[in-house]
């Protein structure tokens, strides 16, 4: 851990030895596939080069133990802090080789010294991708309540605090070498008449403009939509259309993020992606899978063809 010898849950040499023992079988299968694809005029080496460029950032919360609205069950050896999470993410990269960056979440992953965190991660060969902000839980210092919304709250005081969480996340990310911020808000209502549809969206755009103004010139802000949860009657940023309207209003540095679980059942997500590409607003993905909603299952485990 921090300040001591580098810790690896699985030794890289062990992984290499195991891979070496399987190499002859892999080479045989690869050569067979190469000849098979050749008959269709497909160059396997060109595909291999494309795949080598593909990188996925592991979300730091992905190596922790999640929970449901009923309970949370801790697991053996679960990370206690961001340094523990980096160690686990490094093992994932050792195993699969294309997760050289992580995506942290603030304030969950806050530390006193972000320069120290960056150096620690780099010692494991890990860098930092897009950072994420959390305004769906109240600030730990009790300075504001997000019970009735964050960036869209009718209280200016609450909105200002939510904006501050985001600008602070940008500042943290700058030290870590990140180039982007993802904003997902749980703002919404559970009853008809609880909130104004139009005024809440106006407040969201107004708040986002202040966050957007804080972005470095080479950064991107990714707007993430979700149809429901935690609110069920209405969610302010509920679909890709709303996300697109807001991104267009903010400017060229604002893009839309597509989480594969943030859609109503039977939504054609592939077409949503195509539409956003057509209007130059597709900014990124959160890869997962679902049967009903935001199930957060392994990518491709339910809908492999869709993926």
Q: Which residues does each predicted region cover?
A:
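Short, surface-exposed basic-aromatic patches at helix termini and helix-loop junctions that form
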Residues: 117-125, 249-250, 273-279
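Active-site beta-loop-alpha junctions enriched in small/polar residues
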Residues: 61-63, 105-109, 133-136, 186-188, ...
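Active-site acidic/histidine proton-transfer and metal-coordination neighborhood
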Residues: 34-50, 127, 133, 144-251, ...
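N-terminal pre-domain/capping segments
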Residues: 1-174
